[in-house]
Each structure stands twice: as structure tokens, then as C-alpha cells.
Amino acid sequence: MPSSLPTMILKHLADFKPQAATRAWASIPNPNNLPLIATATSDKSVRVYSLSNFTLHSKLEGGHERSVRSAAWKPGVRKDGALTLATGGFDTMMTIATGSFDATMGVWRRKEEQKNTIEDGPLELEIGADGRPNKGPSLRRGGDDGSDEDEGDDWEFSIVLEGHDSEIKHVAYSPSGQWLASCSRDKTIWIWEEIGDEGEDEFETVAVLQDHTADVKCVCWRKDDGNGEVLASGSYDDTILLSKEDGEGDWETIAKLEGHDGTVWSLDWEPDVSIKSDSSEESSVPPTPRLLSSSADMTVRIWSKMPTPPPQNKPSYFNAGIPSTMRPGPVNETWECTATLPKVHDLPVYSINWSKYSGRIVSTGGDGRVAIYEERTKGRNTVGGTIEKEWVVLTVLEGAHGPYEVNHVTWCMRYDNGKKKPDEEMIITTGDDGLTKAWFIEEDIEESKVEA
């Protein structure tokens, strides 16, 4: 019902300064509720910007010989409800992994004496039940322009991880921080585990996945739902593969998702807020998160796991009394495309992101458009039947970076002084023009005009 749709527009909030002089690939918000975002660029560096004032906080450079295509923050460590990031322990040091076209992955750490602080004390955030900080953090300020006075000296290039034969396209930490995955033009996915004692920077290759038949463009982790963390990967071979550890140290492909007619550029797992709103209160079985994908075929799709009926002679993995670590899992899962979002893009859709707060989806691509979608309830066709839902387009922004392609888009919490409510989100875009831009959402435009 179009009349019930909110009238909203995306408005430019700020450009992050200083911008890169060359192509900017992706901007990744800090997952530990710190007001920082890391932008990977083709000038061989990563710029860490402040989300509070949109200026440079620090810079990672000198570790790669070619373009840095991807960056990933290591998740923080939760202790008794607190997310502690700077208390002196190795696991609490800020860490960023970078993937480069030079075929190497780098691991960078924030030096001990220059960790984020509130005044002179450690930065410790109390995390509420909704995953948000009870008190917003503030970062040590640098120069008068808001940048870090010790730029270039505050991140240590700790270790180089080698193994790929060609350009690394994407890197990602698992939600637990246990695994670090990288994918490459060489058609492989490498999975690493940090095994050294505190501060030793020792990594071990635990798996090399070779089931894709072409360039692997992206990887995305699903958090452990009791059956282990799952890695989704998208490729130039037009397919999506799901892989997981079998409980004995071996990694295997558990599902192959087919349906796209072009390169799979981006993936994202459904957040908890969307799962809860979509699940039945009567069901005792937690639903499996859906998977979001975008492609060169100009579509954005949602995939769902199909129920697998237990066989007549139930194997041990159906016995809930046996710990999951002792039960072999089923080899294959069946996934189907259960929704295709309304068509917005005329060129490849390079990036998508599913908001963990609102459940809305944002997409962008080669046509420079940024689109926001929302899932709506349609109702039931029959009494007592299944509730039907549909995805609608809330707004489309044309030419977000002028004539340039937009390579990446992400939802991000607002930390600047202009936010109007504590849980307000903004959208960050990253483009071929070297710019990283922040956008805010203005809703109910017509209604606000009437009230004025």
C-alpha cells in the first residue's frame, strides 16, 4: 500500500577529511561500539576516521605494495556484560586485518601506549541487552583538526600472512574473533586462526577452501547459533557457497546457492532484530538467519534454509542429548531464493548491508544509486494461513558520488552532535572518487512540512 509508505530522503551529512587521492574501496565501522570507521584505499593505506567529527583519527600505511582492497576489525572480548577494549591485555588491543592486491594479508595492532582512552583511564563500555553501549564512548583527541597528532606511528604492522597466489579481494573476522578468512582472485578461501600466546602474533592456516571455480569476491561470517560459525562466500562463478568446521578440525562445504546470473559481489547475514520480528512466538526452534546477496545481474536476493526432515533412522546429530561438539553434522543443507528485492539498479550491485538495528537493507553499485528497502507485512491469504511479507523501496538516492561508481555502503550509528535520538543511524558510502561520505535519513517529509 504505497499510501502507508513513509516519505523519506537521504541527505548529505559530511565528507570524511582528508579524502583519499585515489579510489576508496570500502569503509568498515568498528564493531565494538567505538566511533571509528576504517576505509581501505588504492593508495596502499587504510584511513581510520572519527565518526564523531568526520576527520582522520589515524592511518595504516607502509605494509602493502599494492592497493588495500579490504579491511576488517577484530571483534572485542565480552566479559561479564562489558566490552573491554583497552585494559592492557593482548585480546583487548584494537586489531585490523587488511587484504591487498599484493596477495598478502596484514594484521595491524594499536600500540599499547596509544590505545583509546577516556581522559587517562581505560576505555571500558558496558553493553546493554540490545548490544548497544549504555554510555557512549569518547576518543582521545589529536590535533586541532581532529586528526591524530601521532598519525602513522600509532598502528603497528604486526605480521604478514601469505599464501594466496593472486589479489586478495576481501577479508573478514568471524563474530567470535577465532577465525580470520580471506578470499582471492586465485579462486581460494584461506581460513586462519591465531594460536600464539599473548603478543606473539602467531597464526596458523586451518583450511584452504577450493570449491569455487572462479575469482572469489566476498566472504561473510554467520555467528554461532549452537552449531558453529558458518562462512558464506560469493564468486565470479555466479554461486554462493556455505562452509563450516565439522567439529574435528576439517572444513567442508555444506550448501551451494545457485540462481544469480552474474558475479556475486556482496553478502550479508540477517541480523537478530529482523529474525525476531519474523519468527513465530510459538516456535521452540530458533530460525536460521536468512542470507542477503547482490550481483552483477543487478538484483538483490534473499536466501532461506529449507527444512530438512529427519531420516527414518535418525543419526546422532538429531540427538539433542549429545553435545554438538560430539555430533557429526549433516553434510548438505538446502537453500532457496525466497525473495528478490524490487529492482532499482541498472548496473552491477556492488554492496549491500542489513541494518542490525532497524532491519532495513541498503544497496549501491556501479550506477551510483543508493537504495533503502524495508520488509512489510501483507497479511494472510487464508484464515490461519502463513503471514505473507513483501519488500518495498523506501527511497533512492541518485548519483551519490557524482559520475563515479560507489563501491561500498554500510549502516552505521551516529556519534556526531547533530543526531536527534540515541539510536539514530546514518549511511556511509565509499567511491571511486576517493571520498567516504556520510548520509542521514529524513523521514516523513510531507508530514513535517504540514506541521511547519
UniProtKB/Swiss-Prot annotation:
- Classification via Pfam families: WD40 (PF00400)
- Per its UniProt entry, which superkingdom is the organism in? Eukaryota
InterPro entries from the entry?
A: CIAO1/Cia1, WD40/YVTN_repeat-like_dom_sf, WD40_repeat_dom_sf, WD40_rpt
Region described as Disordered? 112-153
**Per the UniProt entry, what species is this protein from, by scientific name?**
Sclerotinia sclerotiorum (strain ATCC 18683 / 1980 / Ss-1) (White mold)
Name recorded for this polypeptide: Probable cytosolic iron-sulfur protein assembly protein 1
Q: Where are the WD repeats?
A: 20-59, 63-118, 163-202, 211-253, 259-313, 344-383, 405-449
Q: Which gene encodes it?
A: cia1
- Give the GO terms filed under biological process for this record: iron-sulfur cluster assembly
**Disulfide pairs?**
none
Q: Tell me if Repeat is a UniProt keyword of this record.
A: yes
